[in-house]
Every structure is written in structure tokens, then in C-alpha cells.
Curated annotation (Swiss-Prot):
Organism field: Sinorhizobium fredii (strain NBRC 101917 / NGR234)
Reactions catalysed, as given in the entry: a hydroperoxide + 2 glutathione = an alcohol + glutathione disulfide + H2O
Name of the protein in question: Peroxiredoxin y4vD
Other facts: The active site is a conserved redox-active cysteine residue, the peroxidatic cysteine (C(P)), which makes the nucleophilic attack on the peroxide substrate. The peroxide oxidizes the C(P)-SH to cysteine sulfenic acid (C(P)-SOH), which then reacts with another cysteine residue, the resolving cysteine (C(R)), to form a disulfide bridge. The disulfide is subsequently reduced by an appropriate electron donor to complete the catalytic cycle. In this 1-Cys peroxiredoxin, no C(R) is present and C(P) instead forms a disulfide with a cysteine from another protein or with a small thiol molecule.
Domain Thioredoxin: 2-152
SUPFAM superfamilies, per the entry: Thioredoxin-like
PROSITE patterns reported for this sequence: THIOREDOXIN_2 (PS51352)
Residues the record marks as active site: 56
Domain of life according to the entry: Bacteria
């Protein structure tokens, strides 16, 4: 997905907590669109192969949660994690990891991922169609910066991870912000 392109319009089927429902599963369906997530704000979107998978659960998502406040310091208003998983899986994953800041977006059918050009087969792992690992800075629905792991392909034997890490994105944003404002970075 080249920079300066608008994110595609997609409606996501989410499950949101609703205390008026009561019982052991107080959630209702809610449709949220890409406009709801991206319009009028500057956000980081990162996408990964799947909920509950090793790198995603032990490094990428926990690190974004831990570094969330650092993104606010460089003008990011929200951080979203998207995966080709349904709302039930994404909610259970967020609960299992104790997420409080990063918001999860369920791309159950893979429609958004396909329209972003990032849908790949992971049949070699028994996953079916999933997202390639990537991240983007999205400013008012337009891709401002793009971070894609190398080796994009179906049934990739490896699981590359660095370009879309929060550490790399923060470093890039800090450098970009410094250059944009004409500041010289201070090194200690």
C-alpha cells in the first residue's frame, strides 16, 4: 500500500460490551467502519498473522501496549491492531493479554486486509488466509507512512518481524517529527 493512498472503506463486525444485556456474555454486535477508526485522526495501524500466535502475543502486541503513551508524544491519537480473526477471538485475545490501550479490530473475512493488498496464504501453518505483518501511520484516512516486513509471499517459511515493531515505528516517527519541525536531534 503506497503512501498518500486512502485506506479502503470496510465495515467491521465488532462485539462491544453492553451492561444492559446482563448475563455471562454482555456483548452486542456493532458495525464500525474504517471512517470510524481513521477519519479525522492520526493513528498507527498494525496488522499481524493471528491472535494467540507466538510473536504476536509475546512481542508485537504487548510491546505496542507497553509503548502506547510514547506514540502520543509524537502526535499519534490511537493505536489499532488488526488481524484476520473474528470479533470473539479478538476480544478473548485482548482479555487474555490484559489490554487497556491498544484497540483491536477484527477483520474476520479478511476484506480490509485483501483491499490493502496484504492477504497471504498461510496454509503451510494451517492458518488459511491471513495478513502479512505490516504497520502504517494513517492520517485522516490517508496512509502517511508504511512499514512492511520483507519477504511478502504465500506460505512463507519464516515470520520476519522488525519493520512493523513499535520500536522501529517510534524511531521513524521521532526522526520524521524532528525533520519536519526543523529540530536537530539531541544525542546523549
Amino acid at each position: 500500500m503506497p503512501v498518500k493512498k486512502r485506506v479502503p472503506f470496510v465495515a467491521f463486525r465488532t462485539r462491544v460490551r453492553d451492561e444492559t444485556i446482563g448475563g455471562p456474555n454482555p456483548y452486542r454486535w456493532e458495525v464500525r467502519t474504517t471512517e470510524d477508526y481513521f477519519s479525522g485522526k492520526r493513528v498507527v495501524l498494525f496488522s499481524l498473522p493471528g491472535a494467540f500466535t507466538p510473536t504476536c502475543s509475546t512481542q508485537q502486541l504487548p510491546d505496542f501496549e507497553r509503548l502506547y503513551d510514547e506514540f502520543g508524544k509524537v502526535g499519534i491519537e490511537a493505536v489499532y491492531c488488526l488481524s484476520v480473526n473474528d470479533a470473539f477471538v479478538m476480544n478473548a485475545w485482548g482479555k487474555a493479554l490484559g489490554l487497556e490501550k491498544v484497540r483491536l479490530i477484527p477483520d474476520g473475512s479478511g476484506e480490509f486486509t485483501r483491499k490493502m493488498g496484504m492477504l497471504v496464504a498461510k496454509d503451510n501453518l494451517g492458518f488459511g488466509m491471513r495478513s502479512w505483518r505490516y504497520a502504517a501511520v494513517v492520517n485522516d484516512s490517508v496512509v502517511e507512512q508504511w512499514f512492511e516486513e520483507e519477504g511478502f509471499s504465500d506460505n512463507c517459511e519464516s515470520d520476519p518481524y522488525w519493520a512493523s515493531s513499535p520500536q522501529n515505528i517510534l524511531e521513524t516517527l521521532r526522526t520524521f517529527d524532528t525533520a519536519r519541525l526543523g529540530r536537530v536531534p539531541i544525542k546523549f
